[in-house]
Amino acid sequence: KEQTMKFALKSLLVATLTMTSTMALSHNHESSLEHALQSSERNAKNSARDEYRHPAQTLAFFGFKPTMTVVEIAPGGGWYSEILAPALKEQGTYYAAHFPADSSVGYYQRSLAGFKQKVAEDERFSSVKITEFAPVTHLDIAPAGSADMVLTFRNVHNWYMGKDKSGALSAFQAFYKALKPGGTLGLVEHRLAEERADEDQKTSGYMKQSYVVDLAKQAGFELVASSEINANPKDTADHPKGVWTLPPSLRLGEQDADKYKAIGESDRMTLKFKKPL
């Protein structure tokens, strides 16, 4: 009887310690990301766009944890990098698959140079691993089978506009190769209505959700879930200068600026895919 009681108490103690440890780990995960999001070191213009980009909700939907190995595709000026790099710095790994160093495109060179400067000078970026990515030509974004998560934000239209379907498909195949079995691909993209012509994807900067899902499936991914976190019902996706008519680009300048500011940033699909086990 006494032994049974001791065993029961021991089991209860183990269960309590396990629960406490799990709760503490969960809290650490949340606080690491929350700290990165709320940091005063974030660029003020970047933080102001949270109302349209919903980073906390988006990363939660994808299942992001600061212990993961995460690859961000084409981080550009580092809008999401300001969140991901510090959140992953202590316990995880962050690969920034940036523009190729041998690119002849001036914008790519300037963007890469600016990002490298951040990595060199900003302590928050000190653990960032920079790799190269371009559809078809530069696809080694991380060691094969090493990543828990690949993230791409508003990029698919660029690959499609630049190299048509083959370019976009090569990107998804690179993501698949980098991920571990069971790994997650998190994707956000400007959304074109399904009834619109496929040709509109070549110039508008918007993509059909069904088309993007099909590309991912062709590369081997399974669609896990979709979310309306980044939806904007005010966006009709039929603007004179495509998606760039809207904020933050406002390609028309002062012409109808108030109208487009009232619409806000684009309507976006938010998709979570999995590499099968």
Positions of PLM-derived features:
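S-adenosyl-L-methionine
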Residues: 108-139
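Conserved beta-strand signature within the Rossmann-like core of class I S-adenosyl-L-methionine
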Residues: 182-190
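A short acidic, Gly/Pro-enriched loop at the edge of an enzyme's catalytic core
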Residues: 139-151
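C-terminal lobe and adjacent flexible extensions of AdoMet/dcAdoMet transferase-like proteins
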Residues: 219, 258-277
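Class I SAM-dependent methyltransferase Rossmann-like catalytic core
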Residues: 32-66, 83
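A short glycine-rich, Lys/Arg-flanked "PGG" loop and its adjoining helix->strand segment in the class I
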Residues: 85-86, 166-181
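N-terminal signal peptide c-region/cleavage motif recognized by signal peptidases
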Residues: 21-23
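Conserved class I S-adenosyl-L-methionine
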Residues: 66-76
